[in-house]
Amino acid sequence: MEAIIGVIGTILGTILGWVLNSVSNHGKLYLYVSSWDDNFLYNEVGCLVPCISKEKAEYYSYKLTLDIYNSSSEARIMRDITIIYSDDKCELHKSVPKDDTTRYSSGSISFYNDIAPVNIPPKAIIQLKLHDGSHHQNNGLDYIWKTRKIYLTYKNEKSKTTKIAIKSEDYSCYFENHK
């Protein structure tokens, strides 16, 4: 009889351990947009200055700061991080952001690498600082005037795509709203 109780105890202990392990591994990534700053610039005699009209805009740039918390007991990954500009119906433009931590210089010019896959340790918070931009040449800014929503997308360790809203604004009225 004691042998049967011992076997049942072992089986129940194994099942309980498996359940507790599964529960502790069942977590997810929480993304918080700490800051989003975008601006339009134009070239005034060799110097980039803030723009006040759609017609003068030559450059568009953004800076994004993300706080990412992994609530799981296992490391999580973010791959193929992309910024999506949308008009509520379809994607207008995709941008792979540059990672501020990869800055390197050549002379007086700074360069940055595209964001690489990011591993987030278990029960940890990391901060990402990203940026990118567009130039008006070859209709490079046409998409922005049709934009109504901006998203960040990434793929997780199971290649599932997740979409996070960053900003909702009608960019056709950008300069009227930002005087």
What label would you give each PLM region?
Residues M1-I166, D170-K179:
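Membrane-aqueous junction of the first/signal-anchor transmembrane helix
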